[in-house]
Amino acid sequence: MKETSEDNPDPEDKSTDDTDSILKVITRRKWGAQASRTPKKQRLKHPVNFVRFLDTTTDADSYEDCSEYMKEVQKFRMFTGDTDIPYNFVVGSDSLVYEGVGWKVEVDRPLKLRYLLGDCLDIAFIGDLEDGFMPSSEMFKAAIDVIKYGIEKNYISPTYLQLPLDGWRPSYFLKPHR
């Protein structure tokens, strides 16, 4: 995975140090993340068997707006008691991939989704489905690149199950076809 910024701020998480990949990620340092409060035990077990897709229910149209969104959602979630941003990765309206908590950390989950603990990667699209948002083909491609990279590096099982939002059917678009 090719970084678009300096080293990852978490010295134990080398999730963005693979320079031989086509996947480009805006690292936590690049978008201005605060230090995570996630306990070291809150880790994903690889390869994960589930990938969940979400919308952020917000809009951001540029790199600057997307970076600002990442900072604001992290700040709000940490203020309300979560340990960090609630996504592993976020695909911006600018079609760039932003590192949330990355490949190795479990996001904070609501009680009804506790069955996914340790076994699910969350990828969010910046946008609001209730306002008629549909990810662009470039955003879908960025999400597919995340999945392909995850499978290649054994972060995601090649037989993973995709968990789409209610009423949203991205399955055809997001399963990497070989």
Predicted regions and their residues:
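Cell-envelope and extracellular/periplasmic
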Residues: 8-62, 116-135, 151
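Short, surface-exposed glycine/acidic/tryptophan-bearing loops
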Residues: 102-118, 122
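Acidic/histidine-rich, metal-coordinating catalytic segments
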Residues: 56, 92, 157-178
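Long, well-ordered alpha-helical scaffolding segments within enzyme catalytic domains
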Residues: 63-84, 117-169
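Short, conserved "active-site rim" segments that organize catalytic pockets and cofactor/ligand binding
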Residues: 25-106
